[in-house]
């Protein structure tokens, strides 16, 4: 099998210099432990949700063995909101697909920001926050 070599600056997130030295990793079954594709019509809706919300998991431990990541979709009905919560040591990224998101955060949820279609929201570890659908009539659709 040919040796795979990283191309210089091939990806904007590649902050490691290319190298040719061997790694002391155990053998990997790339067929089963490599790239995974989860079709959009096969998301798992059997995940905890707040009333007025529909969550569907795409990437998590149960689906693909992810250790530090949860990704999926959420639909929040008009005027619905989550309870105040945080995600422990994990960071979160939310991409707004449709609708208007209102985020509240802080010890007493005293800070507020809004985001619309095409906007990204970053939530740092341990930050208490609440997601709110800011519209009284439209659903809010996001990818997390």
Residue ranges and their predicted role:
Residues 54-60, 72-88, 125:
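Conserved short histidine dyad/triad with adjacent acidic residue
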Residues 114-117, 125-144:
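Ligand-binding loop in jelly-roll beta-barrel domains
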